[in-house]
Structure formats: structure tokens, C-alpha cells
């Protein structure tokens, strides 16, 4: 019975501290959010970052060790080269309260995104960690009765999410057809070396792009 009553008591204690704006609770939540944020970044890495180098390894354009090193460097560099996606996620999706309840909201959103990343990784489902985080933020905001910027979600999340596969299909088809026509009379052996180099460059660009997001 005592253990059964412990959890509700803990929840009530956290709620009271949040309502009072307890500095100790605020510091604790900030530290927890940093830790949970790093865990989310880790799941984001093993969930999405490997996609950029998978084909380079499978075609033997790169060895696994070199490909992993390149992915680490390009993703790390990309994180410092752009902040537009971070700005969108930080302020364009929801209006989080500027108190302890806002910190709780962010932590719950991160935990939800981590759970989805782990589940989809376990099931082998190709999903986006960015969209998982946005979904976590919206869900946590709705539960907390916080502001959700629906126009921003439609313009910056839903429309790009729907258009990106279509644009990818069109560009992929066009580029592949152009490459096949351009090199239709080329000798296979030197062409293979060039394509492996091009694949390495494209994998590095994908890693950089993933880091930017």
C-alpha cells in the first residue's frame, strides 16, 4: 500500500513545486532536460545518421570505419552551421509557458520522441526524428493546454513532409535518367571509380544536411 501511494504523492510534490516556482526544482528540471536532450540526440544519431552512409558501405565505396568517421564529422559540423530548423522547433511550433511547467512540457516532449525513435528503430521503420520531436511537442502542449501554432505546423511541417517525397521522386528519376544517358558509352571500370567518389561526396553532403537539422 505504501508503495502504491508513493507515486501519486511524488506527482503531487512535483506539481506543488512547479506551481510555486521552486528554484531547486527548476535547476533539477534543467539538468534533466539537458540529459534527456542528449539521449534524444543519441537516438537521433543511431536512427537517422546511418542512412547517409548505408549505401556507401553496401556498395563498398567506403569501409564501415571510414564511413562512420565521416558521418560523425559531417553531422557534428552541420550542427554548428545552421540554426533555422532549431528556431522553428523552438518557437514556431508551440508557445511553451515561461515557468517550470514549460520545462516539464519540453521534457515530456523529448521523452515521447525518444520512445518513438527507439520503437521505430526496433521495428526497422524509416521515420524522422525531427517529426517525432515536433509531434512530442504538440502532444505535450495539448496535454498542458499550451498554445499550438497550427499555421506554423501546416506551413513548416505538414506541407514539407508531404512534398519532400514527391520532389525526391521527381529529382531522383530525372537525375538517374540523365546520368544513364550521359554515360551510356563509358567504360565500366573507370566509371565505377568515379561513381564511388561521387557517392562518397553525396554521403558527406547528406551527413552535413542531417547535422543542419
UniProtKB/Swiss-Prot annotation:
The chain crosses the membrane at residues 23-43, 66-86, 102-122, 134-154, 161-181. Its main location: membrane. GO terms for biological process: phosphate ion transmembrane transport. GO terms for molecular function: phosphate transmembrane transporter activity; symporter activity. Pfam families: PHO4. Keywords: Cell membrane, Membrane, Phosphate transport, Symport, Transmembrane, Transmembrane helix, Transport. Low-affinity inorganic phosphate transporter. This is Probable low-affinity inorganic phosphate transporter. It comes from Streptomyces halstedii.
Amino acid at each position: 500500500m505504501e508503495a502504491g501511494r508513493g507515486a501519486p504523492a511524488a506527482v503531487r510534490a512535483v506539481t506543488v513545486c512547479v506551481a510555486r516556482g521552486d528554484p531547486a526544482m527548476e535547476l533539477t528540471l534543467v539538468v534533466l532536460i539537458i540529459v534527456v536532450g542528449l539521449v534524444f540526440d543519441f537516438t537521433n544519431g543511431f536512427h537517422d545518421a546511418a542512412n547517409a552512409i548505408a549505401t556507401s558501405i553496401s556498395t563498398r565505396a567506403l569501409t564501415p570505419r571510414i564511413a562512420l568517421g565521416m558521418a560523425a564529422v559531417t553531422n557534428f559540423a552541420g550542427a554548428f552551421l545552421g540554426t533555422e530548423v532549431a528556431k522553428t522547433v523552438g518557437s514556431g511550433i508551440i508557445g511553451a509557458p515561461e515557468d517550470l511547467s514549460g520545462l516539464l512540457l519540453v521534457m515530456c516532449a523529448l521523452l515521447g520522441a525518444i520512445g518513438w525513435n527507439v520503437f521505430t528503430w526496433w521495428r526497422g521503420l524509416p521515420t524522422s526524428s525531427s517529426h517525432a520531436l515536433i509531434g512530442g511537442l504538440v502532444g505535450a502542449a495539448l496535454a498542458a493546454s499550451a498554445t499550438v501554432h497550427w499555421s506554423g505546423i501546416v506551413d513548416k511541417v505538414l506541407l514539407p513532409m508531404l512534398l519532400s517525397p514527391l520532389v525526391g521522386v521527381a529529382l531522383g528519376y530525372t537525375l538517374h535518367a540523365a546520368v544513364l544517358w550521359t554515360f551510356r558509352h563509358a567504360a565500366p571500370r573507370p566509371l565505377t571509380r568515379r561513381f564511388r567518389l561521387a557517392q562518397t561526396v553525396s554521403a558527406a553532403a547528406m551527413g552535413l544536411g542531417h547535422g543542419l537539422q
